[in-house]
């Protein structure tokens, strides 16, 4: 079936289904506290839960940057298999958390987008930039776990 000549469906056409339990997913950025982030029903319609959601997304982004710039992932000075497994586990955790932040941003909520970017920026400033590093930090060997 050729759909090339059909007009794109509008967001309002998605609402006119007979199933009243369907929730419309935003396809453009919007501002407001009534949204769902990551899980069905969370944060709901409460302003307090929305603020908690923003704090969680911010902290997840900071943690991703911390893990990305941690000495565990650099792994200089040692080549043991145990440390390689720890590096792999930390990398896997970092990647999983980064995907959670990405999925939160895919809610198209403007507040979530802003706190995610702010979290990555603060995390990079604290752990990745030279603003808070000693000059000798990059020369330190891989620490014992």
From Swiss-Prot:
Membrane-related topology note: Multi-pass membrane protein
Naturally occurring in which organism (per UniProt): Arabidopsis thaliana (Mouse-ear cress)
Protein name per Swiss-Prot or TrEMBL: Copper transporter 6
Localization (cell): Membrane
Keywords: Copper, Copper transport, Ion transport, Membrane, Transmembrane, Transmembrane helix, Transport
GO annotation (BP), single: copper ion transmembrane transport
Coiled coil: none
Family matches, as InterPro entries: Cop_transporter
Highest taxon, organism lineage: Eukaryota
Record's function text: Involved in the transport of copper.
Native organism taxonomy: Eukaryota, Viridiplantae, Streptophyta, Embryophyta, Tracheophyta
A GO MF label: copper ion transmembrane transporter activity
Family, per entry: Belongs to the copper transporter (Ctr) (TC 1.A.56) family. SLC31A subfamily.
Transmembrane intervals: 47-67, 99-119
Entry annotated with the keyword Transmembrane: yes
GO cellular component terms, A-Z: plant-type vacuole; plasma membrane
